[in-house]
Design a protein with these regions (language model features):
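Flexible "arm" and connector segments at domain edges
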Residues: 1-54, 58-110
């Protein structure tokens, strides 16, 4: 199996070979991302394998990152640092974060 970093570089090379970094826009790639997310939703709804859909989403996200000199790892680090101390609770199977008001007091999640 190919390592993550090698595979990420192969995907970047694939994008460049097809002019999908310089020849596309963030908005076009966002539209593509929504298309891939919809395919994921359909396969989840029908209890079908969705590994290709997740992979396609990652391919588009790598494109968006590359055009802004980021990596998925960079973005995951930012996201993790944002959530690592987050508090909240589960509501209908989804984690809802507590809110912090202007005075810095934590308000319980809905």
């Amino acid at each position: 199996m190919t390592t993550y970093y090698r595979l990420e570089q192969q995907i970047i090379d694939w994008h460049n070979a097809r002019n999908l970094i310089e020849g596309s826009t963030d908005h076009q790639q966002f539209d593509k991302l929504l298309e891939e997310v919809e395919e994921l939703r359909v396969n989840i709804e029908h209890s079908q394998d969705f590994s290709d859909d997740v992979g396609d989403i990652l391919v588009v996200l790598i494109n968006l990152c590359e055009r802004h000199n980021l990596t998925l790892t960079d973005c995951m680090n930012v996201a993790y640092n944002d959530i690592k101390y987050r508090t909240g609770k589960m509501v209908d199977g989804i984690f809802v974060k507590d809110l912090i008001d202007e005075s810095g007091v934590i308000q319980d999640a809905v």
